[in-house]
Regions:
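Hinge/lid segment of periplasmic solute-binding proteins
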Residues: 1-30, 41, 60, 188
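Short glycine- and hydrophobic/aromatic-rich loop-to-beta-strand nucleating segment
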Residues: 31-35, 39-40, 98-99
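Aromatic-glycine-rich donor-binding/catalytic loop that engages nucleotide-sugar donors
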Residues: 38-52
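Short helices/loops that flank or line small-molecule/ion binding pockets
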Residues: 61-68, 151-167
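Glycine-centered hinge/linker elements that transmit conformational signals in sensory
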Residues: 63-68, 98-100, 104-149
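Acidic, glycine-anchored loop motifs typical of Ca2+
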Residues: 73-83
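Beta->alpha turn/N-cap motifs
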Residues: 91, 169-174
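Extracytoplasmic/periplasmic substrate-recognition and gating elements
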Residues: 178-197
Length: 197
């Protein structure tokens, strides 16, 4: 059993569920960031694995790499879902993952095992403000909440069509949806909040 998950989910010495290596869906639903290696190289983005390994893969680093990557593919002079972006995201569960990748928590246990809600904190507010700015104030970043109709496959479709340098998703997407992709892609973790994390 996953020790950290069992510890995190136990309340009053009772764990209502557990996860092990046998839970393939838990592994498949591990969130990550995919990147198109050819597009990344075309935009001068190299050494991503080194950036990650050196602890420099932060939300600000993602922003600096992607904020100016935009091509108006449909030539309508409007930024919309038909264009190429540096980073594309779906608007639902893939956004929740930032809380954990930034080092945040919903609940915390004290030394006695008592649980308290810590989600509503200045740190969480900082996370939300940063993500709102990240997704809505940068030409090179697109989130499908701007689309007239929601599709959970939007980012994957853009990525497989080579219209996004980066997308966030889950490891299982590589097996289910990215096999048909002609370009090579890489898998890296969600960004950290800052290098000190």
């Amino acid at each position: 059993w996953s020790e950290s998950t069992t510890d995190d989910l136990s309340v009053n010495d009772v764990c209502p569920l557990a996860i092990s290596d046998f839970a393939l869906s838990a592994l498949a639903n591990t969130y990550c960031v995919f990147y198109n290696k050819r597009l990344a190289e075309n935009y001068g983005i190299t050494d991503l694995y080194d950036i990650v390994n050196e602890g420099k893969w932060t939300i600000d680093k993602v922003l600096s790499l992607t904020k100016d990557i935009y091509t108006d593919l449909d030539a309508d002079n409007t930024a919309n879902g038909a264009d190429l972006y540096g980073f594309i995201s779906t608007a639902r569960s893939s956004l929740n993952t930032y809380l954990w990748s930034f080092g945040g928590h919903v609940l915390e246990k004290d030394a006695n095992g008592d649980v308290s809600l810590v989600y509503h904190s200045p740190k969480t507010n900082d996370f939300i403000e940063k993500l709102c700015s990240f997704y809505f104030d940068n030409q090179g970043i697109y989130i499908n909440s701007k689309e007239p109709e929601y599709s959970s496959f939007f980012a994957l479709e853009k990525f497989t069509n080579n219209e996004a340098v980066f997308i966030n998703g889950a490891i299982g997407n590589s097996v289910e949806y990215l096999r048909s992709m002609e370009d090579d892609y890489g898998i890296i973790p969600y960004p950290k909040w800052d290098e000190a994390q």
